Amino acid sequence: MPTLLQKHEGYLTGHCLVAMPGMGDPRFEGTVIYLCAHTAEGAMGIVINRELEEISFPDIVGQLGIQPTPFCDDVRVQFGGPVETGRGFVLHTSDYQNEGTLSVDDSMALTATLDVLRAIASGDGPMRVIMALGYAGWGAGQLDGELKGNVWLTVPADRQLVFETAVKDKYTTAMGRLGIDPRLLSENAGHA
C-alpha cells in the first residue's frame, strides 16, 4: 500500500468520487468516496457518507481492550467500503501523526493502527476523524475505466466536505459544488 500513497501527477488522490445516479452497484449508490490513493497500480478510498447504525465507536474500542471515554462518544462508525470490512481505518486531519500514519495531502491522513484509537480515546487524537470499517479498492486501471464509463464524478475534497458537512448532506453538497442537481442527471452519456 505505501507505493499507492506516493504523489502521482494526473491522478485523483485527495479528491472525492461522487456516484452517478443509477450506477448499478447498491454498495456505492449515492456515495461520496474520499480517495486516499490513486496511481497506475490502483486506487483506495473511504466512503464518507454511510454511517453504520448497528455499531458504535465505544463498542469498537471496548472490544479492542481500550477503555471508552467521553472522547469516544462523538465518533461515528461508517461503512468505508466492501474490502476488508473487519478492519478499521481512521481518516483524519493531519494534526495527528504516528509511525503508521500515511499522509494523503497537507490536511488529511489515514491511520489503521490501534495507536490512533488509543489517542482518540485519551483525547490526544486528531481534531477531526472518520472511523470506517472497510475501504473501497480498485485494481490497476479499474477506477480509470469506471471514470471513463461515467460511473463517478469527481470533486476536489476539503476539510469542510469530508469532516464538517453532515453525513446525510455530503452527497448533495458534493453534487452542488459541481453545479449539479442529481435528480436531473442521466447515467447515459456520449463520447465524441
Curated annotation (Swiss-Prot):
Signal peptide, first to last residue: none
Pfam families: DUF179
UniProt-listed SUPFAM superfamilies: VC0467-like (SSF143456)
Origin superkingdom: Bacteria
GO cellular component: cytosol
PANTHER family membership: UNCHARACTERIZED PROTEIN YQGE, UPF0301 PROTEIN YQGE
Family: Belongs to the UPF0301 (AlgH) family.
Cross-referenced HAMAP family: UPF0301
Name this protein carries in UniProt: UPF0301 protein Rru_A3059
Organism: Rhodospirillum rubrum (strain ATCC 11170 / ATH 1.1.1 / DSM 467 / LMG 4362 / NCIMB 8255 / S1)
